[in-house]
Amino acid sequence: MLLSHSRSPYKPRYVIKSKTSMIKKCKMKKLLWSWIILFNIHVNGMMMEFDEMEWFTVFNGTKVFQTQNDVFSEAKFPMVGLTLIQSAAAKGAVCLDGSLPGYHLHRGFGSGANNWLVQLEGGGWCDTIRNCVYRKTTRRGSSSYMEKEIPFTGILSDKAADNPDFYNWNRVKVRYCDGGSFSGDSENKAAQLQFRGKRIWLAAMEDLMAKGMRQAKQALLSGCSAGGLAVILRCDDFGKLFPPSTRVKCLSDAGFFLDAIDVSGGRSLRRLYAGVVRLQNLQTNLPQYCVNRLNPTSCFFPQNLINQVKTPLFILNAAYDSWQIQESLAPKSADPSGSWNDCRLNYAKCSASQIQFLQGFRTRMVNLVKGFAMPSKNGVFLNSCFAHCQTERHDTWFAQNSPAIKNKGIAVAVGDWYFERGGAKLIDCAYPCDKTCHNLVFRR
């Protein structure tokens, strides 16, 4: 459901007209699972999800309140069942708690029956025993807590009007339950934790290949957030699954996490990544070309990986990534005075000096993708929005007012790149020039 001002230039499809209805929907929100926001926050030392927070989309200055339930039920998005990988246990390919991993598969049809899109779910990381033990009690660490059905929206939609290039492909969402971007391979017996992300990746691919993916004429590996990072890490592995005759490419959405300096002068995300790498023994599964010259933690950062990925890769990212602002640039641990509290949740409340700091972050991101964008095989869509994950959201992927750069929307840019219909190296001007953004605003 959406709530919007009547004079808004953005006309949402669903509008709450009844105050009573709005209150009921807001109460229902606590019972609903999340769809879009894959962020994590630290609460009492544990990784919690932004699902706990009310969030808004702001389009062209208009605030739009959204709850997940009606967006799915009224728009009639397909609900796709969870498949547990029964052969995974014998391979040691299990979630943090030892439960079976899984995926959701919606079969393709017509001209797309032999094409495959595999989406890797995101959801942050756990960097300490305590965080990972907590994560075992959520869908991010155990299939026991995963939804039995989820809606397929955005790039996973089966409707040509919502997803023109991939709607009739076999579309898969691989669930994320290892806390290490599908890359770990270790365990902690004392805490009864299994860090088996790499094995989950292998088990999922083997299962999908057996279900017809090995006959794919075209394949796309995509993912959002921690799943977007996993795409970069696993892209060449995915490419090697197929013969040279298969068109294989990769799309990383909101996975370009920078090794950035935070507002206190420290490196909050580097500290988190160092914990993940150490705890999950990631160094054995990180790209060898990187660990031969850099330390393992550095090799978990995309900026040190993307130029060496051989398989065609598309980087889609918001230049003012909401997750990175909240958890890397201005986390509470780096802002004890709370001077960033308002800006962290709402870009419109940032001071001039805070915006200047964020502009420096954008400049660094732009500079880091310039070399990557030079080869014709690669694509870039770097929009100057306060957002995170734009492929699975109907409103940002291919809606009437979806974000665009030079009048080209995200879905069109990705399609042009994948099918080689035209150029797709799009880098936006700096904030506040882009009036097409669907910026995220949060309220605790």
From Swiss-Prot:
Keywords: Cell wall, Cell wall biogenesis/degradation, Glycoprotein, Hydrolase, Secreted, Signal. One of its GO terms (molecular function) is hydrolase activity. InterPro entries: PAE/NOTUM. It is an enzyme of class 3 (hydrolase). GO terms for cellular component: extracellular region. Its EC number is 3.1.1.-. Glycans are attached at residue 60. Residues 1-45 form the signal peptide. The keyword Transmembrane helix does not apply. Belongs to the pectinacetylesterase family. PANTHER family: NOTUM-RELATED, PECTIN ACETYLESTERASE 2. Hydrolyzes acetyl esters in homogalacturonan regions of pectin. In type I primary cell wall, galacturonic acid residues of pectin can be acetylated at the O-2 and O-3 positions. Decreasing the degree of acetylation of pectin gels in vitro alters their physical properties. This is Pectin acetylesterase 2.
